[in-house]
Amino acid sequence: MFLSKKEKTVTKSFRISESAFKALEEEARSRNISLNTLANQLLLAYTNWGRFIDRVGPIRTTKSAFNLLLNAASVEAIREAARTSGPDTPKSIILAKHGVLSVNTVLDYIRSATMYGGFAQYSEIESQGKTTITLMHDLGRKGSVFISNVLESIFGMVNIHYELSSSEHSVIIEI
């Protein structure tokens, strides 16, 4: 989400409403970051995720509300919902963003979905020729079931060998 040191920047000016400006200033102060940094983070969130996810009609809800839905459903119903919905939206977003399905574009989707979707924290470590991706979340065991099954359906779209494991608060992918 942050601007890399190597990325070229441009200077532009925009007209925005005074109320939007004041809200942005207040948010930047509360996060202890500059207004410029906040604006860049918001623009990156939109360009890397928002403009694609908005095309498929997202429903914004709190984690606690989503968790209540998960807990009201059986594990098998969660698996089926994840497997059914898993490949459709990611495939649409990956193709809209990259134009091709590949291991790299699938991994970019997972990074973006966690970074901007807010359902998990993403960690990636490369060691001894393997990549280990850990998605940490607070959705409980059924959340891990949902995430794991979505990931399995996404990985099914490309030729990728992976191992997947999960616990109550994490899903681990080894590639």
Residue ranges: model-predicted function:
Residues 63-132:
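An N-terminal amphipathic alpha-helical segment
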Residues 59-63, 147:
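Intrinsically disordered, low-complexity segments
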Residues 166-175:
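Beta-rich nucleic-acid/ligand-interaction surfaces
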Residues 112-167:
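Short, hydrophobic/π-rich interface segment
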Residues 33-57:
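Short, basic amphipathic alpha-helical segments that act as recognition/interaction helices
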Residues 1-18, 28:
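Short Lys/Arg-rich basic patches
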